[in-house]
Amino acid sequence: MTVVDAESRFHVLAVDDSLIDRKLIEMLLKNSSYQVTTVDSGSKALELLGLRDEGDDSSSSPSSSSPDHQEIDVNLIITDYCMPGMTGYDLLKRVKGSSSLKDIPVVIMSSENVPARINRCLEDGAEEFFLKPVKLADMKKLKSHLLKRKQQLPMAAAAPDKPPHKPDEAAASAAAIAEAATAQTDGIISDCSCSGSSKRKAAAMEQEVISSPDQRTKPRLSSTSSGLAVET
């Protein structure tokens, strides 16, 4: 298998305190073309996922098939229910309570068929509850949950925010032009009013000069057949 093929496979984190069950689930997952990381406790699973079990002071490292004290990206978690320290249900609650991990599908396994336990896990976010021994047919059920999450990832990405609303530039330009035109029209009307007023004022002054007493008593010259004559 090429490196590209290996990287393109879904990555499953398997958690089980039983070495035999852990090896079985690892084999089934690999036969189903999944990339697998296994750990033997819920606290180690949290450590690999970037969370920390507050009640676990153990310094032991994960199993040999897992990276040592590294945060890893996984596409699905499959965990045993009955484990010492942290149960599979406790691990489910921690994962679903994390803002960064809550979308990772979690599948729980158990050798005990307890309906109340099964219902509680499914109601609190588990995708499936498998009864042990786990079969190859169970592994095929995982793909639908993996594909569902893969389709949800692009949809979950935040849509780009709309740019802040800006006034329409064309409308702003039109408003500016209209305002300038109005101002120009007002100026023309004002000029016309001033011009008319000046003409009326000049006509009044001319009339006043004509009707002035000095102008009426002033002698006027008139022409006759014998020459010029003075009229009073």
From Swiss-Prot:
The modification 4-aspartylphosphate is found at D80. GO terms for biological process: cytokinin-activated signaling pathway; phosphorelay signal transduction system. Residues 209-232 have a biased composition (Polar residues). One of its GO terms (cellular component) is nucleus. InterPro entries: ARR-like (IPR045279), CheY-like_superfamily (IPR011006), Sig_transdc_resp-reg_receiver (IPR001789). It is found in: Nucleus. Expressed in roots, leaf blades, leaf sheaths, shoot apex, flowers and panicles. Residues 11-147 form the Response regulatory domain. Two-component system major event consists of a His-to-Asp phosphorelay between a sensor histidine kinase (HK) and a response regulator (RR). In plants, the His-to-Asp phosphorelay involves an additional intermediate named Histidine-containing phosphotransfer protein (HPt). This multistep phosphorelay consists of a His-Asp-His-Asp sequential transfer of a phosphate group between first a His and an Asp of the HK protein, followed by the transfer to a conserved His of the HPt protein and finally the transfer to an Asp in the receiver domain of the RR protein. Induction: By cytokinin in roots, shoots and leaves. PROSITE patterns: RESPONSE_REGULATORY (PS50110). Keywords: Cytokinin signaling pathway, Nucleus, Phosphoprotein, Transcription, Transcription regulation, Two-component regulatory system. Belongs to the ARR family. Type-A subfamily. This is Two-component response regulator ORR4. It comes from Oryza sativa subsp. japonica (Rice).
